Every structure is written in C-alpha cells, then in structure tokens.
Design a protein with these regions (language model features):
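Sec/Tat signal peptide C-region and signal peptidase I cleavage site
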Residues: 17-21
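Alpha-helical bundle segments that constitute or directly flank the non-heme di-iron/ferroxidase center
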Residues: 70, 83-91, 223-224
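Extended intrinsically disordered, low-complexity coil regions enriched in Ser, Thr, Gly, Ala
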Residues: 74-75, 90-113, 117, 126-140, ...
Length: 283
C-alpha cells in the first residue's frame, strides 16, 4: 500500500511540474521562446545577422518562437520533418545545420540517415546522394565512424513480397489496377517498380517506425507540390496511425521552409480527404 501511495505521489509531483512548465511557456514572449528553442536545437545562443538583422529576427521568431509551439509533435519529429523538407529542396547549407539540430534534440544518427534515405523514391537518387553527403560530413565532424549499421530487413528472394505486403496494408492494389490499361511489359513493370523501389527497398528498412515514414513521405510530397499523390498519402497516414491533427501539425512545421502555397494545399486536402470518400488517384 505504501508503495502505491509513493507512486501516486510521484505521478502527482511530475504532473504538477509538467503543468507548471507548460504554463510558464505560455507566458513567455515570442522572443523568449525563440531563445529557448534555438539553444536546444543548435547548442548556442541566438544571434542576429550583421547584414539583415530584421529579416533574421522575423525568421527566428516565427520558426522557433511560434511554429515550434503549434501542434503535438516532439522536437525529434519536428527536426526530421525539417530535414526531409530541406533534402527535397536541396538547400544543403541549411540542411547541415538541421542535421546537427536533429541530433542535438535526441534523434539517433540512424534515424536521421533513414529519413534522408526515405526521400529517394520521391526525389531520385542524385538529390538524395547530395543530402547523404552532407549527413556524412556532419557524422564525421562528430567523430562517429562510418558506415553506420545496416538497416535492411529483406533479401533478394523476399524483396517483392515484403514490399507488397506493406503497400497493400496502406494503399491496397490501387496502382496495380490503374496500370492494367498499359501495354506489356509496362502494365506490370510500372506497378512492380513502385512496389520494389518505394516499399521494398525503403519502407521495409528499420530505423524509423511506419508512422514516421508515412508522415515524412507526406511532407516530401507536399514540398514537391505533388498534389495528385497527396490524398492517397493522407489515407496512408491515417492507416499508419497519424491522425489529422498530427498531419496538420507537420504541415505547419514545414511552412517556414517550403512556403505557404504547398503547405496550404495539403492542409486543405487533409481537411477534405476521408477514408470513406477517397477516390483512387490513378483511374
């Protein structure tokens, strides 16, 4: 009985401390919030720009003092969202800073690497390799040996089978059915290529949860402005455990990096798309 009373008291203390911290954050100014988040991300005090101080202040207060406080996302997930956005856009100097930030807030090197790898089916190998090069540079600067641990879970023999199982779980056989109108060999090669390249080679890998992979894929497609594919991935996110609040939070997190138009387009689609009214994108 004493033990349970002790545990209950401990929980009450922790809850009270957490509530006090939340209340304190609510009372902070945007500048104070920006200072706090910036130091957590970059392990340095926030500083201005000697050439464009006003612009830098707008940027920092919006991203670190405002956007970071919208929605229920962990700092780890926020930085992975930023990493895949910057990878997709090939903004490599900023990518390097945010790879460091992603590691500083508690992501493992493997989680960051796998987030970058995940972009390959969407943006192609050349741009992904550019981002991998930046990642490896950061890892070397931190004194971590390369290569990192292998995360593959498939063999050549079960590659297609494993990828197809994941694809069907989230998306059914929509693409396969849509490609039936193509002449051979394309009616099978195109749909099989999608299965093997995206789901077999990358979705089956360890390092990230399926829930994380789906959310990051939605961010990548939004960054690309691939509106046709986005409704299917909204449904995929719902099936993977990312409710609409989580998807909306990811879009808000991406706004300062990818801009308002693409993010707002996906936000509108999240609002409208439901499992019961979803229509296949390829018909």
């Amino acid at each position: 009985m004493k033990f349970f009373k002790y545990v209950l008291a401990l929980h009450l203390i922790l809850f009270s401390t957490f509530a006090q911290a939340q209340e304190k954050e609510k009372q902070m100014t945007r500048e104070e919030r920006a200072d706090k988040v910036y130091e957590e991300l970059f392990a340095a005090k926030r500083s201005g720009s000697p050439t464009d101080p006003e612009f830098m202040e707008i940027l920092q207060r919006l991203i670190f003092g405002e956007v970071f406080y919208v929605g229920e996302l962990s700092p780890q997930d926020r930085e992975l969202i930023t990493v895949v956005s910057l990878t997709t856009m090939q903004t490599l100097p900023q990518l390097k800073a945010h790879i460091n930030a992603a590691l500083n807030v508690g992501n493992t090197p493997l989680q960051v690497r796998e987030s970058i790898y995940l972009a390959a089916p969407f943006i192609g190998f050349p741009r992904t390799l550019n981002a991998v090069g930046v990642f490896n540079e950061v890892i070397k600067e931190r004194g971590i040996n390369l290569p990192l641990e292998n995360m593959a879970t498939i063999t050549e023999e079960n590659r297609f089978e494993k990828g197809l199982a994941l694809q069907k779980e989230l998306y059914g056989d929509e693409v396969k059915q849509a490609m039936q109108a193509l002449p051979e060999p394309y009616q099978t090669e195109v749909s099989d290529m999608l299965t093997k390249f995206c789901f077999s080679d990358f979705y089956t890998r360890n390092g990230l949860t399926l829930q994380q992979k789906e959310l990051l894929s939605l961010v990548i497609l939004t960054t690309l402005g691939a509106e046709k594919q986005i409704p299917a991935h909204i449904i995929g996110n719902l099936k993977a455990g990312n409710d609409k609040n989580r998807q909306l939070a990811a879009m808000v997190q991406a706004i300062p990096y990818i801009g308002l138009p693409n993010a707002l387009a996906t936000i509108n689609l999240i609002k409208e798309t439901k499992i019961e009214n979803y229509k296949p994108i390829y018909e």
